[in-house]
Structure formats: structure tokens, C-alpha cells
């Protein structure tokens, strides 16, 4: 019986470092992520350049683990909150900019769209506390 307990304890301790790393890295409380352009309410014809702003943290490539640094993710028409214990998804609504980009050319279909920026750590997890922009609404003509 003691042998089984030791195996269970060893397995639990082995998994502990992975559980701890499954959450985002710490972020300064004064970090600010924002849109340089477009602004909330902007009406745009066709494709546009989306420009990202960040204060009190740095921008780096995905996979590079520097203190107080991360890379941008753009959420398009996303209403569900992100799970802080899972990497930010990568799909047509969750755009990754893992090369350290601070701007991107975006093509969206005509209509109203919401945009929000999220800063991800080296492994694409949101920081703790999350570093997110205000959600803005734009209209594409």
C-alpha cells in the first residue's frame, strides 16, 4: 500500500511543474495594451492596417521568454472570455502575431466587427493579470 502511495505522490509531483507553467507569466499592473489605429467607431473601406500599442512591457517573438515581454494576438468578433489556463486559440477569430509585429494588414468582410488585443507570453498564454485592450467596434464598407 505504501508503494502505491509513493507512486501516486511521485506522479503528482512530476505533473506539478507543468500545471504551474500552464498559467501566464506575471505582468506589471500598469501594463497598457491599446489600438493606435483604428479607433472605436471607425468606418473603413476594404482592408486596413491595424496598429497595436503597448506601454510598460515589451514586444518579442513567440517562444522568446523575456521578463515583461510578449507578443500580440488580435481577437476578431470574439465574445467568449479567454481561459487563462489555456493557450490563446489560433483560428480565423484569434490572430497570432508571433514574429513580434506591432501592425498588420487586416481584411474583413463588410459589416460591423469587434476587435480586441491580448498580449500572450512565450507559450501563447494570457499574462496574469491579463494584458488586454478595450474592445472596439469598427464598420467595414
Predicted regions and their residues:
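Short, compositionally biased P/S/T/A/G/V-rich stretches that sit at domain boundaries
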Residues: 24-45
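Contiguous beta-strand segments within globular domains
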Residues: 42-57
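Short beta-strand elements
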Residues: 128-141
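N-terminal signal peptide c-region/cleavage motif recognized by signal peptidases
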Residues: 17-19
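Short amphipathic, basic-aromatic surface patches that mediate peripheral association
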Residues: 53-64, 125
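Short coil-to-beta strand junction motifs in C2/discoidin
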Residues: 64-72, 132
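Short acidic/polar inter-strand loop motif in beta-rich domains
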Residues: 81-83, 120-128
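Short, solvent-exposed, Trp/other aromatic-anchored flexible loops in extracytoplasmic proteins
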Residues: 88-121
Amino acid at each position: 500500500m505504501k508503494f502505491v502511495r509513493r507512486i501516486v505522490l511521485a506522479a503528482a509531483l512530476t505533473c506539478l511543474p507543468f500545471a504551474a507553467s500552464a498559467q501566464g507569466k506575471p505582468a506589471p499592473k500598469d501594463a497598457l495594451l491599446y489600438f493606435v489605429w483604428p479607433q472605436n467607431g471607425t468606418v473603413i473601406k476594404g482592408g486596413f492596417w491595424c496598429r497595436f500599442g503597448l506601454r510598460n512591457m515589451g514586444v518579442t517573438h513567440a517562444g522568446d521568454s523575456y521578463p515583461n515581454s510578449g507578443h500580440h494576438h488580435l481577437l476578431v468578433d470574439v465574445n467568449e472570455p479567454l481561459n487563462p489556463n489555456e493557450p490563446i486559440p489560433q483560428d480565423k477569430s484569434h490572430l497570432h502575431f508571433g514574429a513580434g509585429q506591432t501592425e498588420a494588414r487586416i481584411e474583413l468582410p463588410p459589416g460591423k466587427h469587434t476587435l480586441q488585443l491580448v498580449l500572450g507570453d512565450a507559450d501563447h498564454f494570457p499574462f496574469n493579470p491579463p494584458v488586454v485592450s478595450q474592445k472596439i467596434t469598427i464598420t467595414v464598407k
